[in-house]
Amino acid sequence: TNPVLDVDGNELQRGQLYYATSVMRPGGGLTLAAPKGSCPLNVAQAPFDEYSGRPLAFFPENADDDTVQEGSTLYIMFPEPTRCPQSTVWTFDREAGFVTTGGTTSKAIGPHNSRFAIRKAGDASSQPRDYQIEVCPCSTGVERPSCRMGCLGTLGLAEGGKNVLLNINNESPHTIRFVKVKEG
C-alpha cells in the first residue's frame, strides 16, 4: 500500500493535524455544522474558499501504523473541543445518510460506522495528491479484519438545510487535499 500524502508531498502521520481542503470551488475545507442548533454535530464543507476548515487528526486502525496508508481503515476526528457532549470522532449515520460526530474508535469485531478509508481520487482530472474518503464498516489493512464486508461507498457533498454535508455519493465523490496545520 502507499502512504497518503499532504500537498507538500509528506506522509500523513497518526495524530498530526491537517486541514481537508476541497478541490472543487466554491467551498472551503471540512468543518462542523449544528443541524438546527442541536447535537451531535454534522461534518460539513465550509462555505467560503478562504476558510480551511477545522483541523482533523487521523488514527490508523492498525496500531503499528504511524503513517496513514491508502485504503487502510482509520478513525477521523476533530481534536478541538465543541459545545456538544458527543465525541468528535466521525461516524456515518445510516439513518440520516450523513457523516456526523459521536463516533467511536472501538476495534470491536463486527461492522461499525466510524471506520473510514482514504483512497487516491480516480477522476481523469485528479492530481497525484487528490484523495477521496470512503465509509468502510469493516477493517482493511489490519492483521485480523473485524468482519468481511466491502466499503459502503465514497463520500460526496449533499445539501442539508443551510449546510453542505457529507453523504455517500459514488456518482460525484468529494475530492480533497490535505494541508498540514503549521505550528504556532
UniProtKB/Swiss-Prot annotation:
It holds the Pfam family Kunitz_legume. Changing M24A: In 50% of the molecules. One of its GO terms (molecular function) is serine-type endopeptidase inhibitor activity. Inhibits trypsin and alpha-chymotrypsin. Homodimer. Belongs to the protease inhibitor I3 (leguminous Kunitz-type inhibitor) family. This is Trypsin/chymotrypsin inhibitor. It comes from Alocasia macrorrhizos.
